[in-house]
């Protein structure tokens, strides 16, 4: 899989925001982790934080993760904003780049 820049990931997600909202009920989506910190390597996955209009079924959540992987051509670690534990939440919310 080819590595993308943060800007390319943002651009792809932005271009598909309407579909993400309509098909998956995504209210807010952003990138955090190694891509935001400029530490991503060839084998890095992309960490994506998502907030839904209503909590999806597990099947729908997995479907979204697979959709994003196909869209970006990268492995995706999808994290629900509502499931962040307080210890890590501060770090994630400080570095997340929303699109």
Swiss-Prot record:
Sequence positions that bind Mg(2+) 1: 45, 47, 77
Name of the top EC class for this enzyme: transferase
Family stated for the protein in its record: Belongs to the MntA antitoxin family.
Catalytic site positions: 45, 47
Cofactor(s) named in the record: Mg(2+)
Keyword field: ATP-binding, Magnesium, Metal-binding, Nucleotide-binding, Nucleotidyltransferase, Toxin-antitoxin system, Transferase
Binding residues annotated for Mg(2+) 2, in chain numbering: 45, 47
Keyword ATP-binding applies: yes
EC number: 2.7.7.108
Extent of motif GSX(10)DXD motif: 33-47
Keyword Nucleotide-binding: yes
Lineage: Archaea, Methanobacteriati, Methanobacteriota, Thermococci, Thermococcales
Job of this protein: Antitoxin component of a type VII toxin-antitoxin (TA) system. Overexpression in E.coli neutralizes the toxic effect of cognate toxin HepT. Neutralization is mostly due to AMPylation of the toxin by this enzyme.
GO molecular function: ATP binding; metal ion binding; nucleotidyltransferase activity
SUPFAM superfamilies per UniProt: Nucleotidyltransferase (SSF81301)
Cofactor details (free text): Binds 2 Mg(2+) ions.
Catalytic activity as recorded in UniProt: L-tyrosyl-[protein] + ATP = O-(5'-adenylyl)-L-tyrosyl-[protein] + diphosphate; O-(5'-adenylyl)-L-tyrosyl-[protein] + ATP = O-[5'-(adenylyl-(5'->3')-adenylyl)]-L-tyrosyl-[protein] + diphosphate
Name by which UniProt lists this protein: Protein adenylyltransferase MntA
């Amino acid at each position: 899989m080819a590595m993308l820049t943060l800007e390319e990931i943002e651009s792809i997600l932005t271009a598909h925001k309407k579909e993400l909202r309509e098909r998956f009920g995504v209210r807010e989506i952003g990138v955090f982790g190694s891509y935001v910190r400029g530490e991503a390597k060839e084998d890095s996955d992309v960490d994506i934080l998502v907030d839904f209009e209503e909590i999806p079924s597990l099947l729908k959540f997995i479907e979204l993760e697979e959709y994003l992987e196909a869209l970006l051509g990268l492995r995706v670690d999808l994290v629900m904003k509502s499931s962040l534990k307080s210890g890590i939440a501060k770090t994630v919310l400080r570095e997340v780049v929303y699109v």
